[in-house]
């Protein structure tokens, strides 16, 4: 299990703010209740969320405002959820899609 | 979810006096005024909370622990709710029905919603202007706005060691937000030379409001010893699965490296572009601003578009900052109330508002003039873009392909280039690459586009849906028959 506490210094420490537990690719992750899913993932330094369907290279959140679709993940079985405009809640199950082909030479 | 509404089996229909798309400063200002005057108002936003970009709300747990960075936003939202406006968050407005007046939306459970109103107010805001460079698609490369949202509303750092780059005043407050969270900002690369002779000199210019604000950011950055590299642009970002370094170049010679900096995040943006797709889809006239290459709706003083029942307000009507956005929202509300014969605005208040808006416009022009204009930027950056740079992130289309197609089969036509190469055809609808693709096309066919008279300026057209719509929504919208057939 990774906890935000362990990342203090890498991201601003969670202090006493109430924490919520979500599950990311099977790992239990603690984060401040109600923040955006993109913030949880970036705070954990889990940047790669998917592969580009054309080139196969890894992608992560870019615009942070719902425009680029680079942060799409599957949430509680629903695909194509933009992590940057989604707030976390207790028990949320998140799947990224980073498996698969490595990108061709670039 | 705030508003009570049942998810009808297909196509819930909403009829109101006023429907407002976008719950940022502009939409909220309009909603508060209209609803408190007694009109039936619905305000929609695709985000889970109202607030838009500037008033993006921190999670309650964050606000309690670290404070609310913009409490006035919370107050404005509360005012809108108290006035009785129906607030629909998690609602994406993705298109317009064939009748040209019914908005098509999907709610937070992906059910379709149709909305009709006597007045439509479009307050869809802006998105960031980006320009590609090799490696910009690496995880860890983001817009400055993303870093700002992470810091301000989620109290999360985008990285431990960050370079900010691009152009415009927005880079300074973002750098300050990062420093406040203990991030090491290795430097700010600004494409222009706005800070003369030094950053601190801004404060002596004697212009209140926006410039003084800039000067205070500048002072904080100077104290934190954050270098500002002027006339400097990103040459490329490197890293395996994630960005690990950025190489910078002089803006005048964008292909020659001058410095490489190790980073774990890189945030690059060149200001903002108005989000005008819904206005265009509703048939509102737009003009292309020659200096920026952006589409701007043609509006009257109160934001009334070429269609009398449609208003475009806030940054969707042109970039001008939060105060201008709020003033435009209010002006539209007043215009609607006057047309409705309700509580006409006293002449003195109207006059005050007019002069406030003129003052704001002057400040915007002044700040804008400090930074290189987007068209000038394109003219230097586009020709220097290396051939194998991924320009369209969605469809992975490279610079060379765009240049070759533009000069060849597309004969310098932007939309033909798009159709041939698929650049701009992905889920972001060309919002991320549109600026660059236009620049590339222009750079190989200098006879076309901006600088050649307004009639020849080209931008990607607005396309339905404005964002990908869940299949479930479309099926439900089409009615039970289509779902049966599908099962
Ligand atoms: C990422 C980002 C961060 C920014 N941060 C700052 C900052 O820190 N300080 C600053 O001074 N300025 C900032 N700005 C500039 C900002 O745009 C303005 O200051 C201000 O927010 C503009 O207000 P607005 O009401 O016009 O639009 P916005 O605040 O952008 O609000 C528009 C709203 O419309 C919604 N919307 C758009 N299209 C649709 C649709 N089709 N369906 C449903 N909803 C839709 C959006 O979700 C958004 O909430 C930022 C801009 C961006 C893009
Ligand atoms: S980061 Fe761009 S849509 Fe989420």
Regions found by a protein language model. Give the residues of each.
Chain B
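Residues forming the flavin
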Residues: 2-421, 425-427, 431-487
């Amino acid at each position: 299990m990774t906890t935000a506490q362990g990342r203090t210094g890498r991201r601003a420490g969670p202090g006493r703010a109430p924490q919520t537990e979500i599950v990311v690719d099977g790992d239990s992750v603690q984060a401040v209740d109600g923040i955006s899913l993109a913030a949880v993932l970036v705070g954990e330094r889990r940047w790669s969320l998917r592969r580009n369907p054309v080139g196969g290279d890894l992608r992560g959140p870019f615009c942070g405002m719902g425009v680029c679709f680079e942060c799409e993940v599957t949430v509680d079985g629903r695909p194509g959820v933009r992590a940057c405009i989604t707030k976390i809640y207790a028990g949320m199950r998140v799947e990224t899609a980073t498996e698969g082909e490595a990108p061709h030479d670039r | 979810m705030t508003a009570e509404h049942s998810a009808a089996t297909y196509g819930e229909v909403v009829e109101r006096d006023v429907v407002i798309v976008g719950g940022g400063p502009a939409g909220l200002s309009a909603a508060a005024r209209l609803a408190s005057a007694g009109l039936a108002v619905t305000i929609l936003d695709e985000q889970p909370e109202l607030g838009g970009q500037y008033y993006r709300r921190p999670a309650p747990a964050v606000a309690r622990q670290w404070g609310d960075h913009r409490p006035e936003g919370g107050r404005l939202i509360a005012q809108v709710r108290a006035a009785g406006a129906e607030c629909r968050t998690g609602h994406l407005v993705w298109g317009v029905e064939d009748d040209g007046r019914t908005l098509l939306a999907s709610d937070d459970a992906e059910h379709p919603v149709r909305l009709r109103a006597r007045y439509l107010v479009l307050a869809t805001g802006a998105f960031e202007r980006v320009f590609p460079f090799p490696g910009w698609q690496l995880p860890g490369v983001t817009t400055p706005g993303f870093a700002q949202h992470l810091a301000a509303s989620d109290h999360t750092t985008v990285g431990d060691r960050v370079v900010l780059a691009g152009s415009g005043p927005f880079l300074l407050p973002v750098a300050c937000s990062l420093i406040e969270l203990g991030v090491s900002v290795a430097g700010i690369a600004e494409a222009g030379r706005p800070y003369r002779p030094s950053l601190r000199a801004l404060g002596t210019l004697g212009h209140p409001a926006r410039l003084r604000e800039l000067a205070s950011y500048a002072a904080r950055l100077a104290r934190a010893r954050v270098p500002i590299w002027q006339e400097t642009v990103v040459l490329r970002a490197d890293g395996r699965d994630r960005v690990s370094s950025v190489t910078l170049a002089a803006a005048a010679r964008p292909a020659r490296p001058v410095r490489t900096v190790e980073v774990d995040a890189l945030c690059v943006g060149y200001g903002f572009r108005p989000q005008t797709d819904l206005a265009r889809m509703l048939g509102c006239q737009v003009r292309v601003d020659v200096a920026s290459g952006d589409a701007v709706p043609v509006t009257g003083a109160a934001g009334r578009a070429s269609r009398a029942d449609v208003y475009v307000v806030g940054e969707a009507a042109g970039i001008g900052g939060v105060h201008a956005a709020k003033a435009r929202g209010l002006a539209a509300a007043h215009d609607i109330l006057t047309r409705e014969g309700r509580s006409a605005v006293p002449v003195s208040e109207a006059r005050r508002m007019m002069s406030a808006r003129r003052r704001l416009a002057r400040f915007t022009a002044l700040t804008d003039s400090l930074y290189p204009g987007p068209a000038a930027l394109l003219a230097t950056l586009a020709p220097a873009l290396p051939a194998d740079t991924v320009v369209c992130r969605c469809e992975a289309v490279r610079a060379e392909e765009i240049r070759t197609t533009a000069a060849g089969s597309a004969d310098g036509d932007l939309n033909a280039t798009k159709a041939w190469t698929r650049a701009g055809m992905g889920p972001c609808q060309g919002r991320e690459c549109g600026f660059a693709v236009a620049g590339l096309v222009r750079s190989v066919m200098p006879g076309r586009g901006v600088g050649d008279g307004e009639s020849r300026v080209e931008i990607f057209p607005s396309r339905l849906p404005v964002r990908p719509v869940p299949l479930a929504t479309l099926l439900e919208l089409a009615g039970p028959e289509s779902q049966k057939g599908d099962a």
